[in-house]
Amino acid sequence: MTSIKIDKMTVEQFGEALRREAIAKQNDAFRKMILLDESVGRWVVTRAVYAEGPAFVAACILAVRKFEDFTEEMDPYGERSMGRLEIEGETVWFKIDLYDVDYEGGSDDPSEVTKTRRVLTILFPSDY
């Protein structure tokens, strides 16, 4: 999990670090939960991932749920919103986008779960 180093931060930087940590925790919970409806968010796969077949898609979903290997390269803001993994010899990415409750635009306050809906997309790098 993330850790905030507060030794040399302005109050604004500290607030931003707290916001990002909240988003990271919410993204982790979202990745690991089983959605009963779309009140929290949606999972989608690209056409190219879907074309690999149901076993491949299922393997991707399981791997995303278990994923913990976040790197600064793939997740530079520490929000745990993007990762890279290998599935059956293929590089697969996932990313989490944060929308308003109507899925029409970005959330005004991504750290507030009542104002944010998540969309997790599983994709190949070539889909990006």
Kindly label every feature range from the protein language model.
Residues 11-86:
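Compact soluble domain cores
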